[in-house]
Amino acid sequence: MILNSIRRYNTKFRDEYGQLVIACDSSSWRKEKFANYKAKRKTSREESPLDWNKFFGFLNGIRDEIAEEMSFPVVHVDRAEADDIIAVLAESTQEFGQGEPVMIVSSDKDFIQLHRHSNVKQFSPMKRGALKVDDPVFYKFEHICKGDSSDGVPNMLSADDTFVVEGGRQTPMRAKKIKEWYDACNGNASDVDALRSAMNEEQYRNYCRNKLMIDLDCIPEDIQSNIMDKYKSQQGKNNAKVLKYLITKKFSL
């Protein structure tokens, strides 16, 4: 199933977008900055009857097989999530005006912030079509303000432990207020002085907390370098073993 999905998307997009790259999750640097990042997922796994160690071992085995036997770059970097890898590779196409076309195959809306680059598009397997918004810059600002409950990141009106304490609930946030903050900095969220003036101290503190977790521009430089090194080290992989591997796996050609 995994191999057939890779084949399907490679066939669908390779002529226009070139080389397929597989981005893989590792432990996240974000947990070092915010202890509650994805904390509920760990709790859910502990309560689940599924043997998660065995499951992740299976996935890691597939990852290693593909990296060894197939010609696609498989990028797996310590402390980097797949989101980080995709973001860094997409951003690298902006250097020196290269602008090579990029297609992100994912239903994850976290990548919408990368749509600010005209050469970056996204295909959602869940929607079976393009994923897009009218204003990706505002979308990122709104996303930071609202947080991301699936990752354990509360909105910027709520405490750090909102999603890990029993009965914790977020303070409601109005869309009108988000628009006021956005307008206060004229759509330039890097204008720290404007944001500080528009928000109180706690709001701005929580905004910065969320920005670090959500904004893909905040990936540490050492991790960015490791991602690019891992990617570049896999250029020109040998295709000689691919056919034998596909036949062994009874892959549908």
Model regions: which residues?
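Noncatalytic, basic helical substrate-engagement surface that gates or grips nucleic-acid strands
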Residues: M1-M103, R116-G129, D215, D222, ...
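Short C-terminal domain-edge/linker segments immediately following a structured domain
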Residues: W52-K54, D134-P136, Y245-L246
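Generic secondary-structure boundary/loop-capping signal
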Residues: K31-F34, K109-F111, Y204, N210-K211
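Intrinsically disordered, low-complexity N-terminal regions enriched in serine/proline/glycine
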Residues: R8, N36, V137-E142, T162, ...
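Long, highly charged, low-complexity intrinsically disordered interaction regions
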Residues: D78, A82, L89-M173, K177, ...
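Short Gly/charged-rich anion-binding patches and loops
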Residues: G61, D110, K241
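Accessory alpha-helical DNA-binding modules that contact the DNA backbone or grooves
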Residues: D148-I227, N239-Y245, K249-L253
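Amphipathic alpha-helical surface "interface" segments used
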Residues: Y231-N239
